[in-house]
Structures are given as C-alpha cells and as structure tokens.
Amino acid sequence: MARKLKAPNSDFELTERALAPFLDRIILGDCLEILPQMPSSCVDMVFFDPPYFLQLPPKRLIRWRVRTVVEGVNDAWDKFSSFDEYDLFLRRTLEEVRRVMKPNATIWAIGTYHNIFRIGTILQDLGFWILNDIIWVKANPMPNWLNVRFTNATETLIWAVRDKAAKNYMFDAKAAKAIDNARIALNVWRIPLCRGKERLKDEAGRKLHSTQKPEALLERVICVSSKPGDIILDPMAGTGTTGYVAKKLGRRFIMIEKVEKYVEAAVKRLEGLQICATSI
C-alpha cells in the first residue's frame, strides 16, 4: 500500500526538506554546479576559502642554503588565465553563496595580499556589508628564502553580513573576549599553521593540501559567529576542516569540494563523526 506523504505546512518545512540531501555531508563536485541546487536563505554562516591565484612561476623554488624544494602552492586549482577570469569565478560563486545565506547570515572570506582586496571589492559590489577584517598572524610562517621581500606572516579574514540592514547577525562577544583571555575582542589573532598530526600528508609524506587551515582558526570563527544547531557552509572545503570543527562544536554543515583526493581524505578524517561523501 502506498504511503500518503504529508504536505509541508510552512516555508521552513519546505526548506528543511530541500536541504536534507546536503546536510552534514561533504559533496564531491564543483560548487558552481552544486550551490544552484540548494534552496535560498538556508545557511547561517559561510567560510569562504577560495584559490589564492598566487601566479607562481612554473620553476621549483629551492632553499638556497640547504638546497631543498619549497612546498608552495602550485596546484592546478590555483591557476587562472587572467584576473578577469579569476574575478568572474569569485563573483559567480559569491552570488550563489549570498543567495543561500539567510538575511542575517555572515561570511568569513580568507586570503592573502594576492587576492583579499579583490574579494573585498566583490563582496561590497554584491551588497555584503563588511563588519571587520581579522589579521591572522602565523606564529610559524614559511620564510622568504629568496631574500627579496618581507616574509609574509599574515592572512586576512573579511567578516561580512549578507545585508547591511541586518542588525541581528550572530556575534558572541563572550566567546570573542575569551580569545587570548582579553578584556576587549581584538581583530589580531596569533595562530600557528597546522602542523604535526593535524597536517594531513599523502603517501609520500608530503602535504596533502597546500593551504590546509588550522582547526584553531575555524574554532574561533565558528564559536564567535554561530550557535549550536546553526548550518555552516564551506563551498571549497578542501580536506574538511570546517565540517570537522563544526561537528565537534555541535553545528550542522554543508561542504563542497571538487578534488576527489581531498574528499576522500576528509571522509577518512571524519569517519568517527559519521560523515559521508556524496556526488550530486
């Protein structure tokens, strides 16, 4: 006997049903193909960690004193033919990201001097309202082996709300002040790059992902700007740090990643948390 389905009685129920295939999953696919399949106004916070577009030369960088290879960011996913192509990629992605954000949702966009100014401009062009910039000071940065410029020891996070008119976005002032046990919440965070057991490696012992973010960074971001039960989106999730930390902190999450080996590593990393990878 066929079971009669109960019709949803609210927009919330409709959204919940449409969102079910995405929740608490790392989805193997291109975010520009997956995001349009998601319902509008459904996520509470976004962590946006796009390619840096470093434009590195094809030659290998060698540490001149010890003659070893520098493991920089020279992956295929970081290559674009021009600034125009890169900007179009950012704009198209952020348009879809903004659509799936709730009106009071916030986004954390991270980058280096190579791309963060372009990201900030596009965020403003699309109607996001910037709340803060956070300077992440790396306690253990990669030295500048060529001795031609200062060692780049920071990255910038732009924290923005979807709409300027939103006054009820989530900000946990107590959690913010707990950072470094400060009386006031400062926008400078000193956190080391991930290392040791936290840094995922391939079979040859090399870094699996060149820009894996430390869990401590995501813990601060998620604690300050979301509450338990909130839905966190990471459209370019890499090896799954955002979902891993979100799950530990009692949040729901949606992760998208197009590189299969990263998805496989994320699934293995999160097996104890009952995460599954799917391809839509």
Q: What kind of region is each of these model predictions?
A:
Residues 1-264, 275:
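Core catalytic lobe of class I
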